[in-house]
C-alpha cells in the first residue's frame, strides 16, 4: 500500500504531510517513527514528512523528551476502537496528563481524533460532539499545549475550536467539505470516521475554511484501504482516499458552495485559499519555507481515475470517474 499511495502526495498539490502512526502494530517509539520516515523518503524524497507517535500507555514523559530531540513533530490520540487500527487507543485521558505536561514544555503538538466510542446512547452521529468537553478540558489544563482537533465534521466542533485560545486549531478535510450523511449511507467509498454529518454541518465547515480564520486549516486525512475492504465483508473499512486530487477537491467544494449560495465567489480569494491550504497550517506547525514551492491549478480535462492498482493491492479514490482541476508545480 505504501508504495502505491506515497507517490500520489505531490500529485494532489501537497509537499508536507503529518504522518499518522496507526499502523499495525502502532508507532509508539521514536526509533520506529524514524524508520518509517526513511521508508517514505525512499519512495518520494520531495515531501516533508512530519512524524508522530501513537498515544499509548508505553509513551512516557521521557519518550516525549527523546522525541523532541530527534525531530518528532507530535503525538496522535485515537479513542480506543473508534477508527482504523485504534484498538490500542485511549480510554482515559487523565492517565496521560504527565505526558501532555511534558509535551507542553517541549512545545510538541497533540493531534486529536475527536470522538468518543459508540456506547450507550452515543452513535457515529454524536460521537464528535460528545468529545468536545474533553477538548475544552485539555485546553484548560494545558493552555500552552498546541492541540489540533483533526477532521472536524460538525458546526459544534467549529464553535469549540473558536472558543479556545490560539494554541488550539481544527483541520478540515476535502471530503467533509462536500459530503453529508446521505453520501456515505449510499456509498462505502464515502465512509470514514468521523462520518460526514448534516448539510448544516457541512456548510459550517465551508464557512470556516473560507473565513480566513487561522485556527482552521486543511488536513486531508486521506486514508487508503484495499478496495475489497470497502466493498463489504465483515465490516466496511473507515477511510476516504483523496490524496491524488486532494487540493483539487477543495477547490471543487468551494466552487460548488458558491453555486449553492453557501459561499460568495468574491470571497474565495487567492489569499483565502493559500491561508487555508498552506499558510495557516504551516504557521501552526512552525514549518519554515526554505524551498518555497507553488502549485498552478488549471481547469483542464482532468479526470479522477476509477481505481489505482499495483501488483499487490487496488485502491478506489474519492470522486472516482469525475472531472476535476489539474495541478502542476512551480518553484
Predicted segments, located by residue:
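Divalent metal-dependent hydrolysis catalytic cores, especially in the metallo-beta-lactamase
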Residues: 5-29, 41-56, 72-85, 107-118, ...
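Catalytic metal-binding/acid-base residues of hydrolase active sites
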Residues: 23, 54, 115, 152-153, ...
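Short, electropositive alpha-helical surface patch
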Residues: 41, 49, 68, 123-143, ...
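Structural signature of the urease/amidohydrolase superfamily beta/alpha-barrel
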Residues: 277-312
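Active-site neighborhoods of metal-dependent hydrolases
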Residues: 172-240, 300-302, 306-331
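Di-metal (Zn2+ and/or Mg2+/Mn2+) metal-binding site signature of metallo-dependent hydrolases
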Residues: 1-8, 281
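His/Asp/Glu-enriched, well-ordered alpha-helical/loop segment
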Residues: 214-217, 223-288
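Histidine/acidic residue-rich metal-binding segments in metalloenzymes
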Residues: 59-77, 84-218
Amino acid at each position: 500500500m505504501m508504495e502505491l499511495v506515497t507517490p500520489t502526495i505531490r500529485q494532489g498539490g501537497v509537499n508536507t504531510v503529518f504522518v499518522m502512526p496507526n499502523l499495525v502494530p502502532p508507532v509508539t517509539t521514536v526509533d520506529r517513527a524514524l524508520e518509517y520516515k526513511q521508508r517514505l523518503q525512499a519512495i518520494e524524497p520531495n515531501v516533508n514528512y512530519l512524524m508522530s507517535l501513537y498515544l499509548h500507555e508505553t509513551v512516557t514523559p521521557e519518550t516525549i523528551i527523546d522525541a523532541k530531540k530527534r525531530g518528532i513533530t507530535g503525538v496522535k490520540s485515537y479513542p480506543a476502537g473508534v477508527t482504523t487500527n485504534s484498538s490500542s487507543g485511549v480510554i482515559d485521558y487523565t492517565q496521560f496528563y504527565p505526558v501532555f505536561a511534558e509535551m507542553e514544555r517541549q512545545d510538541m503538538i497533540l493531534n486529536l481524533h475527536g470522538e468518543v466510542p459508540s456506547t450507550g446512547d452515543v452513535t457515529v452521529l454524536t460521537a464528535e460532539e460528545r468529545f468536545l468537553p474533553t477538548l475544552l478540558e485539555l485546553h484548560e489544563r494545558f493552555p500552552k499545549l498546541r492541540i489540533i482537533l483533526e477532521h472536524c465534521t460538525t458546526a459544534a466542533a467549529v464553535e469549540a475550536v473558536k472558543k479556545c485560545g490560539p494554541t488550539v486549531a481544527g483541520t478540515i478535510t476535502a471530503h467533509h467539505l462536500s459530503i453529508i450523511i446521505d453520501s456515505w449511507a449510499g456509498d462505502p467509498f464515502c465512509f470514514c470516521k468521523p462520518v460526514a454529518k448534516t448539510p448544516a454541518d457541512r456548510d459550517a465547515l465551508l464557512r470556516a475554511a473560507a473565513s480566513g480564520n487561522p485556527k482552521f486549516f486543511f488536513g486531508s486525512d486521506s486514508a487508503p484501504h484495499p478496495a475489497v475492504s470497502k466493498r463489504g465483508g465483515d465490516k466496511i473499512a473507515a477511510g476516504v482516499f483523496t490524496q491524488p486530487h486532494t487540493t483539487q477537491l477543495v477547490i471543487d467544494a468551494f466552487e460548488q458552495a458558491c453555486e449553492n449560495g453557501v459561499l460568495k465567489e468574491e470571497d474565495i480569494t487567492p489569499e483565502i485559499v493559500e491561508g487555508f491550504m498552506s499558510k495557516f497550517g504551516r504557521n501552526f506547525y512552525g514549518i519554515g519555507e526554505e524551498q518555497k514551492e507553488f502549485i498552478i491549478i488549471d481547469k483542464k480535462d482532468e479526470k479522477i481515475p476509477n481505481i489505482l492498482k499495483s501488483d499487490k493491492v487496488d485502491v478506489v479514490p474519492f470522486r472516482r470517474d469525475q472531472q476535476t482541476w489539474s495541478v502542476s508545480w512551480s518553484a
